[in-house]
From Swiss-Prot:
Protein name as catalogued: Probable aquaporin PIP2-5
Biased composition, class Basic and acidic residues, residue ranges: 1-18
Taxonomy of the source species: Eukaryota, Viridiplantae, Streptophyta, Embryophyta, Tracheophyta
Membrane topology: Multi-pass membrane protein
Transmembrane segments: 39-59, 76-96, 125-145, 166-186, 201-221, 249-269
Organism: Arabidopsis thaliana (Mouse-ear cress)
Record's GO cellular component terms: plasma membrane
Motif NPA 1 positions after renumbering to this chain: 106-108
Length: 286
């Protein structure tokens, strides 16, 4: 999800390693490059496919476990199957798009990387737009193919489950997104990539597995958002009051979790704050 580090692995030394320079906040030259628009297309298509497969899985599970249609409710894929669908699709799509767009597929991931200066503001905003549009189109395809079941079973929209407070829902989204974005930073750390040649290849695996684990933990609470595009796409296409109740949770929670993960990785684990402070003190001041 970040630029690949190329170098001679045999001569690598922790003392010799230097972090790649941070991306500028604004870089208008990106708008004139085909690679930028190719990355936007990749994010759009990846998010579309992600929502299509996962929401179709959710709708299929609910139809299989509907007592009116299937008295034997053990025929569904269950929560485990839904979690595998979400985690598996992230693994596949990150693997396919990492070399083109970085494989974000999630506005919260993009936001975390923006705070860490891994992407420019222009790219981050355009990625989020592409992701949200892709999510809307993906859910629209599900509704087109499963129109009767889609409305009947809630359109795969996120919502706060009965018995849980708003605070619990927000906390679940913050912690779940923290786990995901923290995993993204760790799996794509350029220093680890320079030291261990297998790390870039295996990065999609822990990222997908993090999504899988978080879904197991939070599906009973919020249906698991941790991806504002996923929540927005389902809410817009389903478009019932229930889908919009507490919808803000699925934006505030993921963005807060991503911000905390970015701060923790950059300024605690990587000691970025200490380096920045040392650099500031070493500069002459007038």
């Amino acid at each position: 999800m970040t630029k690949e580090v190329v170098g001679d692995k045999r001569s690598f030394s922790g003392k010799d390693y230097q972090d790649p320079p941070p991306e500028p906040l604004f870089d208008a030259t990106e708008l004139g490059k085909w690679s930028f628009y190719r990355a936007l297309i990749a994010e759009f298509i990846a998010t579309l496919l992600f929502l299509y497969v996962t929401i179709m899985t959710v709708i299929g599970y609910k139809s299989q476990t509907d007592p009116a249609l299937n008295p034997d409710q053990c025929t569904g894929v269950g929560v485990l199957g839904i979690a595998w669908a979400f985690g598996g699709m992230i693994f596949i799509l990150v693997y396919c798009t990492a070399g083109i767009s970085g494989g974000h597929i999630n506005p919260a991931v993009t936001f975390g990387l923006l705070l860490a200066r891994k992407v420019t503001l222009v790219r981050a905003v355009m990625y989020m737009v592409a992701q949200c549009l892709g999510a809307i189109c993906g859910v629209a395809l599900v509704k087109a193919f499963q129109s009767a079941y889609f409305t009947r079973y809630g359109g795969g929209a996120n919502g706060l489950s009965d018995g849980y407070s708003i605070g619990t829902g927000v906390a679940a989204e913050i912690i779940g997104t923290f786990v995901l974005v923290y995993t993204v930073f760790s799996a794509t750390d350029p220093k680890r990539s320079a030291r261990d040649s297998h790390v870039p290849v295996l990065a999609p695996l822990p990222i997908g597995f993090a999504v899988f684990i978080v879904h197991l933990a939070t599906i009973p609470i919020t249906g698991t958002g941790i991806n504002p595009a996923r929540s927005l796409g389902a809410a817009i296409i389903y478009n019932k009051d229930k889908a919009w109740d507490h919808h803000w949770i699925f934006w505030v929670g993921p963005f807060a979790g991503a911000a905390i993960a970015a701060f923790y990785h950059q300024f605690v684990l990587r000691a970025g704050a200490i380096k920045a402070l040392g650099s500031f003190r070493s500069q002459p001041h007038v």
